[in-house]
Design a protein with these regions (language model features):
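Short, amphipathic alpha-helical interaction segments positioned at domain boundaries
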Residues: 243-257
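Sensory/regulatory domains in signal-transduction proteins
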Residues: 83-149, 153
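Juxtadomain coupling helices with adjacent low-complexity linkers
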Residues: 2-29, 120, 126-175
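Structured interaction and signal-relay segments at domain junctions
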Residues: 2-10, 19-103
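Short strand-loop junctions, especially beta-strand C-caps/beta-turns
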Residues: 124-129, 188, 241-243
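Short coil/loop residues immediately preceding or within conserved phosphate-binding loops
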Residues: 38, 107, 235
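Signal-transducing coiled-coil/dimerization helices and immediately adjacent hinge/linker segments
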Residues: 152-241
Length: 257
């Protein structure tokens, strides 16, 4: 093992040590890997979304110019990228929609996987030279760290989604039949995640009293599912706070159509 490789391995080790039980930062891992290997780096999710992008400031980028954090591949190209199940060297990144026309160059593609399946792909590329064995070791270490962090992020997101669903279900369970009907009609008319509604018009249309709508909104607001505010003659401002609300309400819509 070369002295430089050992030094870089210790950098990764120190990052893990410093993080302790807290999640590591995707950006820090990707940037360190890019600096250590003089590479452009792209971290892509399973669905083809760029989670992190690093461009080596010292050389012309091998990544297509449109690649920035949040950019997403189309399904066909994401499937091509997902077809690399083992570490690949010098793949044609243009086929995957990743590489630039001028500098497809030298590259490494590393699949980020757990026993539950693929989580994403780590891509390193540069135009001036091929990757040495020491650099491949560093890329594999970065991939290992990123796989761990992606798995943790996905797990935490699943926990948040389950909690949000439970909160919405609990809020719905407090509604009477007429209040549930009112809520469903309200959110059928709400355009997007927030907007203004006139409760009296909805009450007349549905055939319920305005107080039923007020009570239903109050229960949802108490549960932290929505924010509502009366604006007098203009109507009532409503904003959805819980992202699970619409999906849960959709399960009840058929009975009120």
């Amino acid at each position: 093992m070369s002295e430089q490789l050992l030094k870089n391995v210790r950098v990764f080790r120190e990052m893990v040590k410093r993080a302790g039980e807290n999640p590591l930062n995707f950006r820090e891992i990707v940037e360190k890997c890019g600096e250590m290997t003089d590479s452009d780096i792209l971290l892509v999710s399973k669905k083809g979304k760029a989670l992190q992008v690093y461009r080596d400031p010292a050389r012309q980028s091998g990544l297509a110019p449109e690649w920035e954090q949040g950019v997403t591949l189309d399904e066909e190209k994401a499937a091509v990228l997902g077809g690399y199940v083992k570490t690949a060297t010098n793949a044609d990144l243009r086929i995957c929609g990743v590489g630039s026309e001028e500098n497809a160059g030298n590259n490494l593609l590393l699949s980020l996987e757990t026993e539950k399946g693929r989580l994403g792909t780590l891509i390193l590329c540069r135009s001036d030279r091929s990757y040495a064995e020491d650099e491949l070791i560093l890329a594999e270490m970065a991939a290992l760290l990123l796989t761990k962090e992606l798995a943790l992020a996905i797990y935490e997101e699943d926990i948040r989604e389950k909690k949000n669903n439970e909160i919405v279900r609990a809020a719905i369970s407090t509604l009477s039949f007429s209040e549930l009907a009112a809520i469903i009609h309200i959110f059928n008319e709400l355009d997007g995640e927030e907007g203004l509604l006139i409760a009296s018009k909805i009450a007349d249309r549905v055939g319920i009293t305005r107080s039923v709508i007020v009570n239903a909104l109050r229960k949802f607001e108490s549960a932290g599912v929505i924010e509502s505010r009366s604006l007098g003659m203009k109507g009532t401002y409503i904003r959805i706070l819980n992202p699970a609300l619409r999906d849960e309400l959709a399960k009840y819509k058929r009975g009120f159509q």
